[in-house]
Regions:
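Cysteine-nucleophile active-site neighborhood
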Residues: 86, 91-156, 160
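Amide-donor transfer/coupling interface in amidating biosynthetic enzymes
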Residues: 1-58, 75-81, 85, 112, ...
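Short, glycine/charged-enriched secondary-structure capping and boundary segments
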Residues: 40-42, 71, 103-106, 139-142, ...
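N-terminal beta-loop-helix "entrance" segment that forms/cooperates
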Residues: 60-72
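Short glycine-/acidic-enriched loop or helix-start segments at secondary-structure transitions
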Residues: 37, 66, 100-101, 134-137, ...
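Short beta-alpha junction loops
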Residues: 58-63, 129-131, 344-346
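Short, mixed-charge low-complexity intrinsically disordered segments
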Residues: 333-347
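Short glycine/proline-rich turn/loop motifs
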Residues: 71-72, 92-95, 236
């Protein structure tokens, strides 16, 4: 089992201690039961073999009806983290399939987040409604809502996962990218777009064994016999099993490995490895796709960069100490041929 550190959230670790080298994942958690969703992601990442640090986020513009104070105390909002860099972004599902996108109270902010992630995140993963919405904004596909719910556990081209949605992405609606899994009945289930390092998943690999059952019982209480029973899920004695767990772990393991092998977003997406403004060591390390090193005054490192990012000045003073060896390693990870000028105690 690998180490998963929850820096915030309703199930936050009491004393978070991130593992050196852990992948930094931002989760925009839009699911109704956020605590359960946090636990589901922690469980699946723990089984991947990759150390992971999770930060949970909410749209600032979302009007939360219940327990708003508790959620805002536990979660970051997008404006609070938008100056940070992450290895991965996950946008979860949300019970919004039957609502027009423009009726979602945080729709404008969600579009802003999707633009932001192209320069601040190495890889993005969109789930269920999150995939439906992101695919439309990104121009990867155009899905549509459907009157009958797709619910159950389905195996498509070797991938077994739960589906729970009121939308369909027809195979013919894919504008770019690759359909990894899909069929005529379920539509595109997994789509990847390498141009933005994005993966769109119509289902819920992260679901626990009982999640579909709980959703079904909830729908029964609301709609009675009209509630559709999940297909290929319940056994004859009304039990269920976690038939997708192995596929889920394998999927997330591959996703984390792909993030590890990819370039930092600033180098890959903007054509400029670093901006021409000073950065703290923390921001530079995140931009390089590395975990910031531990040490005193680590955030006082000053980077002065030329417009072409071919030279960097490191200033080390008694008041603001810089670990030059680690700074050098980070800079050469970003730009192997970069020229580094080090100034110590005011003397070049």
């Amino acid at each position: 089992m690998s180490t998963v550190t929850r820096l915030n959230g309703l199930t936050r670790d009491p004393v978070p201690q991130p593992t050196t080298g852990a992948k930094k994942i931002l989760v925009l958690n839009l699911m109704p039961n956020r605590a359960v969703t946090e636990q589901q992601f922690a469980s699946i990442f723990a089984a991947t073999g990759f150390p992971v640090t999770l930060t949970f986020c909410l749209p600032a513009s979302h009007q939360i009806r219940r327990h708003a104070d508790q959620l805002h105390a536990a979660y970051a909002t997008f404006p609070e983290i938008e100056d940070q860099f992450f290895d991965g972004l996950i946008i979860t599902g949300a019970p919004l399939d039957q609502k027009p996108f423009t009726d979602v109270d945080y729709w404008d902010e969600l579009q802003e987040i999707l633009t932001w992630r192209r320069t601040h995140v190495q890889g993005s993963l969109f789930l269920c409604w999150g995939a439906y919405a992101a695919g439309a904004v990104d121009g990867v596909f155009a899905g549509h809502s459907i009157p009958e719910k797709i619910t159950g556990v389905f195996t498509v081209e070797g991938y077994t996962m739960p589906q729970s949605r009121y939308f369909l992405v027809p195979l013919a609606a894919i504008e770019r990218g690759e359909i990894v899994a899909g069929n005529l009945d379920l539509g595109a289930v997994i789509v990847t777009d390498d141009t933005t390092q994005s993966t769109y998943v119509a289902g819920h690999f992260e679901y626990s064994a009982n999640t579909l059952a709980l959703e079904y019982y909830r729908d029964q209480a609301k709609n009675g016999d009209a509630a559709p029973e999940p297909q290929h899920y319940f056994t004859g004695d009304n039990q269920y099993s976690w038939t997708w767990r192995a596929d889920a772990v394998a999927f997330y393991r591959r996703w984390l490995a792909k993030i590890t092998d990819s370039q930092p977003p600033a180098a890959a997406d903007t054509g400029t490895a670093l901006p021409t403004i000073p950065l703290t060591s923390l921001a530079a390390a995140r931009r390089a796709g590395l975990t910031p090193w531990q040490g005193a005054n680590v955030d006082t490192l000053i980077y002065n960069l030329t417009p072409h990012t071919d030279r960097v000045w490191l200033l080390d003073t008694p008041a603001h100490h810089v670990d030059l060896a680690n700074a050098w390693a980070i800079l050469h990870h970003i730009q192997p041929d970069i020229q580094v000028i080090a100034t110590k105690e005011g003397i070049v």
